[in-house]
Amino acid sequence: MHDLVIRNGLVVDGSGEKPFTGDIAIDDEKISLVSESIKDNGKKEIDAEGKLVTPGWVDIHTHYDGQVCWDPYLTPSSWHGVTTAVMGNCGVGFAPVKPGEENFLIQLMEGVEDIPGSALHEGIEWDWETFPQFLNAIEKKEFVMDLGFMIGHGPLRSYVMGHDRCQNQVDASESEINKMSELVTEAINAGALGFSTSRTILHRDIYGKYVPGTEASSEEMRALAFGVDKAGEGTLEITSDWLDEEIEMSWMKEYVKKSNCGLTFLQTNGDAVKTILFSEEHFLKGKNIRPQFPGRNVGLMFGFESSLNPFMQYPAYKEIAHLPHDQKYEIMKDADFKNKLLSQKPNLEEEIEKKLAETDNTKTREEIEKDAELLINLTTNYKTQFVLGTPPNYEPKKEDSIAEISQKKGISELEVMFDEMMKNNGTNLIYAAFTPYENYKLNFVEQAYGLKSSVAGGSDGGAHCGLICDASMPTTNLSHWARDREAGKKFPLEKLVRKQTKDTAETFGLFDRGEIKTGMLADINIIDFEKLNVSHPRMIHDLPLGGKRLIQDATGYVATIKRGQIVSENGSATGVLPGNLIRGKQTCEVKSDISKVSFFDRTIRLAFIKLAQLYWKYNKKQIKSTIVSSTS
């Protein structure tokens, strides 16, 4: 008799092959049998007729580094079928750290990932100094899913150089570089899944300074990359603007050429064409190089409860901004208040003077004025701001934009924003497309998902608490791209499932999960596909000290199974916590990815890439929006 048998489900097994109807037997933590019909009974059985049965989602771009200290369920990701989460992304994290310097790492995390510093101060125990000690501390806790960690460039540079020198982007000395490389190797030998770095000007601490490593030299990056290689396993994760693609590519090329370890980077637009082509070429040649692509536009949520809305610098709003939401809403319902607010202009001078007077301010007036101007532009780009419906549509049409609604109603864009955000007792949200949204279509994502090397990534679960809510991305990847999309091409379920299971798992050497096959971990989702949806995001105050965060519920998850145990049924947690800390590469008898690409297919794709690279060399301006599709 088996521990658990799932019967009659439509199995989308994570391999990318066509779905099939069958049964799955589970014993202990693993899948013991997959068959058209299993004769033996189970101690517990689930009838999955009419339902999808998939591997549990493997989300490789999260920021639950602090939340693991107080939330064993890692919500909202666990509500969306995630059974494995990788954190330590973007070069931020909480180890290593010298006693007394914890606040610096909190300031980095708060600035980069918009996680309230007060919650981090209250919720983290800090019973570690080194990265191996950090892993030991996490391993003592219980979780609903498996957790993997990378060592981040920010804490690493701070630990070796001191936070004053590391933050000012000074070059590390040769001895400091060697020490950092040694600590990367030490971390991976202790169980870290890799090393992460941030090379984007968007990532800053709470005072506006670039995070450590943003402008680190090629020599430093090369040494840290080969710190991964020296350990013999692990993956290098980069978040980059690719502002100087040639310089960034120089050390990456050497790493990929000489190392058999992994490389992954978050890609949110199509500008880094050369890097994308480089990734596809070397993946087809057998290297573990994986660009991550979000399945929807990175979207900011503007509302009266969120961290941003277009009225934040208006005098009338500033007078009530400190009030609890219910009191604020009662005031804003008054027509006189609305008229007063809409008649005003933002008072930037007061905010600029306030910033200049701050003790820790290091910016000039000109820099602060520029930041204020950018913020105004961000909140008033009405052509790419949309009313977020229920269920939300993450590929909205032009007519859904604030600009179009304003024109249709004959009122100002600001009045449209105010009226929409006041709905549902002032909790309604406006969706602002932050990354490029050309022609009101997710064409870039469509092209990216056609790449063999691409994986689903960028949910940022646990981060951007008051402004972004993309931890639900694994759910919308299926509901939108396989079922609901109207703006263009859809993808078959088997392709989408693989992108966020087998492919993401193998990016970090987790070969024991991501497929429904005998011997694999029994991490499984049972899904009512017709009911699969995400809710309208909502604000809750459940972080330590009452900190706020946006969350998003899901419908359609009949059950989520982790290591053979049912952790969620019909959206409710069962209370079982079978998740483990992942220490390093995990093995199982699985064929390599490259064997899945036929010789003919690989040859044709490589030929396309070579042509594309030549075309890019001589026609850079013409190629940016079209070249990726030539490889799909």
Regions found by a protein language model. Name each.
Residues 259-360:
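Polar, glycine-rich mid-to-C-terminal structural blocks
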Residues 58-60, 85-87, 147-151, 195-197, ...:
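Hydrophobic faces of well-ordered beta-strands that scaffold small-molecule active sites
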Residues 1-5, 10-56, 537:
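Histidine-rich, glycine-flanked metal-binding segment
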Residues 70-186, 190-194, 619:
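Divalent-metal coordination cores built from histidine and acidic residues
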Residues 369-371, 443, 447-454, 459-460, ...:
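C-terminal cap of metal-dependent C-N hydrolases
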Residues 229, 284-288, 297, 301-322, ...:
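His/Asp/Glu-enriched, well-ordered alpha-helical/loop segment
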Residues 70, 96-101, 204-208, 244-256, ...:
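Histidine/acidic-residue-rich catalytic or RNA/ligand-binding cores of hydrolases
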